[in-house]
Design a protein with these regions (language model features):
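Basic, helix-initiating cap at the start of DNA-binding domains
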Residues: 1-25, 29-41, 54-58
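Amphipathic alpha-helical interaction segments
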Residues: 13, 84-92, 152-159, 177, ...
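Key DNA-contact positions within bacterial/archaeal DNA-binding proteins
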Residues: 44
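A short His-aromatic
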Residues: 47-50, 54
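Hydrophobic alpha-helical connector segments
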Residues: 59, 70-103, 150, 154
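Short secondary-structure transition hinges
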Residues: 91-148, 166
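C-terminal peripheral helix-coil segments that are non-catalytic and often amphipathic
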Residues: 128-129, 133-137, 141, 170-214
Length: 214
């Protein structure tokens, strides 16, 4: 039997309450009772949707992954050049993780709690497929050096992205500035010299679109 809209609303309220508490005190310090109280629901309503706190965290990881996948697919399926897609998608996902609390919480939970949901590894594989295709296009188009393996380029981008998020969280500063600096450094190693000025300017232009006000 399909869940009724009212039940879906309750489920979302519980997830939102958990996200707030995970942000405020951390996953480890958040109790099941605190989630139920913050959601202003009952134990019965909670257990209708979730078996325990880990199940809520898993649902947050899942939902965050879905939202990231939607943004990634929209950009990588566009008609833009391959390397432009890769640059745009890193900033778009950074923007999503900055302004969407589910995505931001999902990122943090996934880094420490891979074991509670298959969504972590699944979202990695899904992102890899999109990124590798765009990387193949970038090599074919001559914007990335032809001796660079698209799969290895994805691994580098994924590592760069995780590092930017970790630094931004640790320093409480601008994620987009970290992304821009990382791209400027990485482009020197993957882009032919004659293409470098264009893509350095492209990164700067995209970064300005997402720049946080002073």
């Amino acid at each position: 039997m399909a869940k009724q809209p009212r039940a879906e609303v309750t489920r979302q309220v519980i997830m939102d309450a958990a996200v707030e508490l995970f942000d405020e005190v951390g996953y480890g310090e958040t109790t099941l009772t605190a989630i139920i109280e913050r959601a202003e629901t009952t134990k019965g309503a909670f257990y209708y949707h979730f078996a325990d706190k880990e199940a809520v965290a898993g649902a947050i990881i899942d939902e965050g992954g879905v939202r990231v996948e939607e943004v990634t697919r929209r950009i990588t399926d566009s008609s833009s050049a391959g390397l432009e897609k890769l640059i745009r998608v890193t900033f778009a996902v950074a923007d999503l993780s900055t302004h969407d609390r589910i995505v931001r919480s999902g990122y943090r939970l996934r880094q420490g709690l891979y074991q509670i949901s298959p969504a972590g590894s699944r979202s990695y594989v899904e992102r890899m497929d999109h990124y590798v295709k765009a990387a193949h296009d970038a090599v074919f188009e001559g914007d990335v050096c032809d001796d660079i393996d698209p799969g290895e380029l994805f691994e580098l981008l994924h590592t760069m992205d995780l590092g930017c998020h970790l630094l931004s969280d640790a320093l409480s500063d601008d994620l987009f500035a970290h992304e821009a600096r990382a791209w400027r450094m990485m482009l020197r190693g993957i882009v032919p010299p004659d293409k470098l000025p264009y893509f350095q300017e492209f990164v700067a232009r995209v970064a300005r679109q997402y720049a946080q006000p002073e």
